[in-house]
């Protein structure tokens, strides 16, 4: 018989750097899930990604307090900022887009880079083909203040 699903939880954790401190520990602890088991499994599954890449993960937890993980691709904004070569700034040391998108340009990417990002994100996007996925990524680029050349 299949396990009974109690619920699911969405978190964004840096690849290979999950630890029991907030936000992971409290989110799992209040649901009675084994935090260290999650940390070990997540770090093992995200080992092939570049360390520190923000990785969305969906945790489905069951009645017997077991869980399953589903890793998603990094956010489009992160991939765009990385492709545009934006330098990390601020106290969290993350790349930052334009403070005034549409008026100020933070960086630029090519159509080929947009296509590459769209192909990588294809399984997580609600798009039927790469062209539709590219339009979604173009919208994200515009929101970040990144111009597209070519």
Swiss-Prot record:
One GO term describing the cellular component: cytosolic large ribosomal subunit
Keyword DNA-binding appears in the UniProt entry: no
Any one biological process term the GO annotation gives: translation
CDD domains documented for this protein: Ribosomal_L11
InterPro entries referenced in this protein's UniProt entry, alphabetically: Ribosomal_uL11, Ribosomal_uL11_bac-typ, Ribosomal_uL11_C, Ribosomal_uL11_C_sf, Ribosomal_uL11_N, Ribosomal_uL11_N_sf
Protein's UniProt keywords contain rRNA-binding: yes
Record's comment on post-translational modification: One or more lysine residues are methylated.
Molecular function terms from GO: large ribosomal subunit rRNA binding; structural constituent of ribosome
Keyword terms: Methylation, Ribonucleoprotein, Ribosomal protein, RNA-binding, rRNA-binding
Superkingdom of the source species: Bacteria
Functional description taken from the UniProt entry: Forms part of the ribosomal stalk which helps the ribosome interact with GTP-bound translation factors.
Annotated family: Belongs to the universal ribosomal protein uL11 family.
HAMAP family: Ribosomal_uL11
Subunit structure: Part of the ribosomal stalk of the 50S ribosomal subunit. Interacts with L10 and the large rRNA to form the base of the stalk. L10 forms an elongated spine to which L12 dimers bind in a sequential fashion forming a multimeric L10(L12)X complex.
Protein name as annotated: Large ribosomal subunit protein uL11
Natural source organism: Cereibacter sphaeroides (strain ATCC 17023 / DSM 158 / JCM 6121 / CCUG 31486 / LMG 2827 / NBRC 12203 / NCIMB 8253 / ATH 2.4.1.)
Gene: rplK
């Amino acid at each position: 018989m299949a396990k009974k699903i109690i619920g699911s939880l969405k978190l964004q954790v840096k690849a290979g750097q999950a630890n029991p401190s907030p936000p992971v520990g409290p989110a799992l602890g209040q649901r009675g899930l084994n935090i260290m088991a999650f940390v070990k499994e997540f770090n093992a599954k995200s080992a092939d990604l570049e360390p520190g890449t923000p990785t969305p993960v969906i945790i489905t937890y069951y009645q017997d307090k077991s869980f399953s993980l589903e890793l998603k691709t990094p956010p489009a904004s992160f991939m765009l900022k990385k492709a545009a070569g934006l330098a990390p700034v601020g106290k969290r040391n993350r790349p930052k887009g334009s403070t005034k998108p549409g008026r100020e340009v933070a960086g630029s990417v090519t159509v080929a880079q947009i296509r590459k990002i769209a192909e990588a994100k294809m399984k997580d996007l609600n798009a039927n083909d790469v062209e539709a996925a590219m339009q979604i990524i173009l919208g994200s680029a515009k929101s970040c203040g990144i111009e597209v050349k070519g």
